Design a protein with these regions (language model features):
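Glycine-rich phosphate-binding loops that contact phosphosugars or nucleotide phosphates
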Residues: 211-363
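Short, well-ordered alpha-helix to beta-strand connector turns
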Residues: 14, 124, 216, 264, ...
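Short, flexible loop segments at the rims of nucleotide/cofactor-binding pockets, characterized by
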Residues: 198-200, 245-247, 269-273, 368-373
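Conserved short alpha-helical segments that host acidic/polar catalytic motifs at enzyme active sites
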Residues: 1-174, 185-217, 351, 369-372, ...
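Predominantly extracellular/luminal regions of secreted and cell-surface proteins
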Residues: 177, 181-182
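Acidic catalytic cores of enzymes that act on phosphate-bearing nucleotides/polynucleotides
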Residues: 386-394
Length: 394
């Protein structure tokens, strides 16, 4: 519930410890009951405040913020990332990650903590990716990474590549409008990487599937949010093209459900950011069951890539806007191409039909440009429709 009391940051009862949080604490209710029984007073309905009081409880026992964070985090279940400060240790921030994205940006006389790279573009090119169960003690001049046993961890510093255009609106009113207009070029790039000519075989880049695709008896596509909509689109096409059962699972359901994934299942995980906790967990679970794995992501430097060798990069570029535009288009194009690739390998589509579909696909960037050229008409319709509270699509 959006209220002032529920808003971050959250404070300990004495106001000396402060915390911000991204994620979900699954066992917060039982911890809250324990803390309330010990006299801690809660002012919000959030799971975040439970973490504040839990770490404060441990700090009062130990007198060390680092030790208190480690002891507190070990009692939490879920997917979360925290930043914590204490008035007694004012020169540092402790950041900790468990199943939620967190990076450290390294600057000169300054360091940054963020959940994703776009937040620090323009500030630094040097970053450290924290792994699950790691914390960083961040000071102005230094960053020290440790595990939850308090042991130092040596982390590689990665240099991120980006164009200055990424953080510029390039004359557009806002990033979403800019990213909508980037879609034709994103489609061209996708097609150039996977289908250079209508008579060429489709390529999936460095990804390698079992050469005997006949061993694939079913396909399961795992995703969340917008990516889940892209997956449902793929299911409609693939079942017709491949003559195989294709299931689409919300990653949050897949990880808790008893499913029949095995070595004859092709499991495809889709995550724009590559940091979607449930999708990463689902991909890991499918890997343990021996499934063939493939991941589609827009972020080749992300966590999901580290748990799967087969990656089809979307190459849509960093998406600053919250609303998915060009990344969703890239997902649709990549899934269409991947479906045609599998159909080629299985010979499940007539050759002439396949060639015609390829030719039509190569026309898509120009057709998208044609649609976007009617921006004045689109704006006129948008102004008319924006007052409606709901839409029914048939």
């Amino acid at each position: 519930k959006a209220t002032t009391a529920n808003a971050h940051p959250h404070l300990s009862n004495d106001g000396r410890l402060v915390l911000v949080h991204n994620g979900i604490i699954e066992n917060y209710q039982e911890l809250r009951r324990m803390l309330e029984a010990e006299g801690f007073v809660f002012h919000s309905e959030t799971d975040t405040e439970t973490a504040v009081h839990l770490i404060d409880r441990e700090y009062k026992k130990r007198g060390s913020l680092e030790e208190a964070v480690i002891a507190g985090v070990k009692q939490l279940c879920g997917a979360f990332a925290f930043c914590i400060m204490h008035k007694d240790e004012p020169d540092k921030i402790i950041a900790v990650r468990q199943n939620a994205p967190l990076i450290i940006g390294l600057g000169q006389g300054e360091n940054f903590i963020a959940s994703d790279i776009p937040a620090i573009i323009g500030k630094t090119r040097n970053i450290i990716h924290l792994a699950d169960g790691e914390l960083a003690v961040v000071r102005r001049e230094s960053v020290e990474v440790k595990n939850l046993n308090g042991e130092n961890v040596i982390k590689p510093v990665e240099e991120i590549e980006f164009s200055p255009d990424v953080i510029s609106k390039l004359g557009y009113k806002h990033f979403m409008l800019k990213e909508i207009n980037e879609q034709p070029d994103i489609l061209r790039k996708c097609l150039a990487n996977h289908l250079p000519a209508p008579d060429a075989p489709i390529s999936v880049g460095d990804a390698t599937l079992n050469p005997d695709v006949e061993k694939i008896k079913n396909i399961c596509i795992i995703a969340c949010g917008t990516s889940l909509h892209a997956a449902m689109y793929a299911r409609t096409l693939w079942e017709e093209w491949l003559q195989l059962p294709v299931c689409v699972e919300a990653a949050s359901e897949y990880i808790y459900r008893r499913n029949l994934t095995d070595e004859n299942t092709l499991v495809i995980g889709i995550s724009q950011s590559g940091e979607t906790a449930d999708t990463i967990s689902a991909v890991r679970q499918a890997k343990e069951k021996g499934a063939q794995l493939l991941v589609l992501t827009n972020r080749p430097d992300s966590s999901i890539v580290r748990c799967c060798d087969n990656v089809v990069p979307l190459n849509a570029g960093i998406e600053v806007s919250v609303a998915a535009t060009k990344s969703y288009t890239a997902q649709l194009a990549a899934l269409y191409l991947l479906g045609l690739y599998l159909a080629e390998q299985k010979s499940s589509l007539d050759g002439r039909v396949l060639s015609e579909m390829k030719r039509d696909l190569l026309l898509l960037p120009a057709q998208t440009e044609e649609i976007l050229s009617h921006s004045a008409d689109i704006q006129k319709q948008a102004r008319k429709l924006c007052t409606f509270r709901s839409f029914v699509y048939m």
